[in-house]
Amino acid sequence: MIGDSCEDKFTYGTSHRLCPDTPAPVFLPNRDIINFGMAGNVYENLKGFDLKCDLITNSEKIVKQRFIDEKTNHTFLRVDIGDKVNRAGFNPTDIQKQDYEAIVIADYGKGFLTEDDISILCSINDSVFLDTKKTIGPWCKKAAFIKINTPEFEAIKDRIDTRDWVDKLIVTLGDKGCMFMKKEGFNYYPTKKVDVFDLSGAGDTFQAGLVAKYLETKDIRQSIKFANDCAARAVQKKGVVSSL
């Protein structure tokens, strides 16, 4: 597991009035819940699936703090601290193919991994699962599977040759599930309808479920369906979920 990680801090409280000098709610914090976020959340989810894994991530601290109404789960505000980190302090070529059954990359674009770093990682293992905020291109064509979300796909769909991403590209569609690029076009994988309570970390849970099931079955269709189910369960719970 390689990528940018953070501390996900959820501050739950109440708000019953507006500030008298400005139209803003007065928030009274009651409790904090702190989780390992971003690549750290994928890592915790992978361990939750009983996978043995290592984590390579940033040493600098990134904090995402959300102020949330205890009763309604409405988020009043998110405050990000330390949004950028230094480049990874390791040489990607030091990771040997025989050491790992798969490499999972969660690239949140905070500066920990460059395109060159990811390209090297993709070339040294046949099972690289990439989730990236970068614009996909030749640098990541050797990844086994690449997951991006709908806004990221919409931003690039007119600038890429979809034939380059056959049997590789997975686009998540929120509550509609996801789609997987095939030679004849996208295959759609709908998800079951659930009551959405919190979207935090759902993509991380999807990625971990995808990896876990694929390592078990080597069947990407089964893996996508399982990942959809994992994400659907995650959004029904408060905060970042690392154990289903």
Language model: regions and residue ranges:
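A secondary-structure boundary/capping signal
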Residues: 2-3, 149
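Active-site metal-binding loops of divalent metal-dependent hydrolases
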Residues: 4-5, 108, 205
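Conserved phosphate-binding/catalytic region of the ribokinase-like
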Residues: 98-99, 116-142, 155-244
